[in-house]
């Protein structure tokens, strides 16, 4: 047998073995989106007032995708762009939802687009009978390391000290302990100058708790102006934080983060309250931040997160996504499980039950694990949910989509 013939035969056999487990492209079911619904979970109490709305996208093929995020009005408008469309054209649908109206999507609408995008990827995985991380090329890590905010660990009480919380977090298997530099009761006085003195003592206690080989994180939560952020970062440098989170205000991040970078030596992380690829592009390229806080569904879903991850991988910047909800976290495990750079996720659901999600996250010993369940790997108990929205008709009012000659979507 000639070498060329042999190689061709081997390649064909390998392809046959691989494709034997999957439907051929031509055999993929033709389907259309027929209905989008949104629900509130039982006793909704979203962390930090973020949306825990559950979103479903139904198709005429009997496959339903599950997502999380958004609010009634922003979901209604974006969902209306999906009715009658093929859910397998995810990038095209994302571009349409993002570009079809006069104003570019702001943060609230981007969150809704992200929730719907998660459901579209869930459908894609279910069509192929594969977890989304396999659809995206396969996981590159065995698990995702996690950090725990405030040491919310079974057995730790409300009167536990910072040192006790930090120690318990590391002993539970988490990579890092996280606490807020600005944690005070709402509607009370906040003096940034005085808070920095308190901050130094708390950071010293956190370091003592995690030990010399453990990690800890402090969140400034944007409550410090630039001068106090500089002072705060320099005051705690000796205690070696894994990173300082959101040290300056969102409104000025493009100006203040580059300035802060030149004034301090601690690693910086930012972006939980803002962040599409254009927001992060220059900051990542110039290494003004060491870790990107981009998260789901806030950035616009998995479709947009993959592009942000590509920026981070190009410039060797890590990703430490903010926690928004359990379904979104399942999507993060699938999405960032395929990212080859450093990843650490926020997880605060240890010991908590989720009645509407009998199957969701695979968490053990401070780590989140990928699984082999199709799609995002989550299942809903519909009896636990309260419907707040149903969309069955396309939204065309004031929507205008334009196309290049090749059929790709261009600007409004």
Regions from the PLM with identified roles:
Residues 1-2:
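N-terminal secretory signal peptides
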Residues 5-26:
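N-terminal export signals
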Residues 20-48, 57:
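C-terminal segment of N-terminal export signals and the immediately downstream linker at the start
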Residues 36, 58-130:
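Metal- or metallocofactor-binding catalytic centers and their adjacent structured scaffolds
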Residues 62, 116, 129, 219, ...:
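Conserved, mostly hydrophobic/aromatic
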Residues 77-78, 85, 89-92, 234, ...:
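Shared catalytic-loop signature of beta/alpha-barrel
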Residues 143, 151-258:
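Metal-dependent enolase-superfamily TIM-barrel catalytic cores that perform enediolate-based chemistry
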Residues 376, 380-412:
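Extended hydrophobic packing segments that form well-structured cores
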């Amino acid at each position: 047998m000639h070498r060329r013939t042999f190689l061709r035969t081997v390649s064909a056999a390998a392809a046959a073995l691989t494709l034997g487990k999957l439907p051929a492209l031509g055999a993929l079911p033709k389907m259309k989106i027929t209905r989008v619904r949104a629900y509130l979970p039982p006793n909704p109490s979203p962390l930090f007032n973020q949306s825990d709305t559950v979103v479903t996208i139904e198709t005429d093929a009997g496959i339903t995708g599950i997502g999380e995020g958004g609010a009634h009005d922003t979901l209604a408008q974006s969902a209306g762009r999906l009715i009658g469309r093929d859910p397998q054209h995810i990038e095209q649908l994302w571009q349409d939802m993002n570009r079809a109206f006069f104003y570019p999507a702001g943060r609230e609408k981007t969150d809704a687009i992200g929730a719907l995008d998660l459901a579209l990827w869930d459908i894609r995985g279910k069509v192929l009978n594969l977890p989304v991380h396999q659809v995206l090329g396969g996981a590159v890590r065995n698990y995702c390391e996690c950090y725990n905010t405030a040491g919310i660990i079974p057995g730790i009480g409300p009167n536990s000290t910072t040192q006790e919380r930090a120690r318990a977090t590391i002993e539970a298997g988490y990579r890092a302990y996280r606490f807020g530099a600005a944690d005070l009761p709402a509607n009370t006085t906040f003096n940034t100058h005085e808070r920095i003195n308190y901050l130094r003592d708390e950071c010293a206690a956190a370091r003592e708790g995690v030990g010399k080989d453990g990690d800890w994180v402090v969140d400034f939560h944007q409550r410090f102006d630039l001068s106090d952020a500089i002072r705060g970062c320099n005051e705690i440098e000796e205690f070696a934080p894994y990173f300082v989170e959101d040290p300056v205000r969102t409104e000025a991040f493009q100006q203040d983060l580059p300035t802060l970078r030149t004034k301090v030596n601690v690693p910086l992380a930012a972006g939980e309250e803002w962040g599409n690829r254009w927001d992060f592009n220059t900051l990542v390229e110039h290494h003004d931040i060491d870790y990107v806080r981009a998260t789901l569904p806030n950035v616009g879903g998995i479709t947009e997160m993959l592009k942000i991850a590509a920026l981070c991988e190009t410039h060797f910047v890590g990703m430490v996504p903010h926690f928004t909800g359990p379904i979104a976290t399942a999507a993060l495990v699938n999405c960032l499980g395929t990212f080859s750079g450093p990843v650490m996720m926020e997880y605060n659901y240890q010991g908590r039950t989720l009645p509407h999600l009998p199957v969701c996250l695979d968490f053990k010993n401070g780590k989140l694990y990928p699984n082999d369940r199709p799609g995002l790997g989550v299942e809903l108990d519909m009896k636990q949910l309260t419907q707040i929205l149903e969309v069955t008709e396309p939204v065309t009012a004031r929507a205008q989509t334009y196309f290049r000659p090749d059929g790709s979507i261009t600007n409004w």
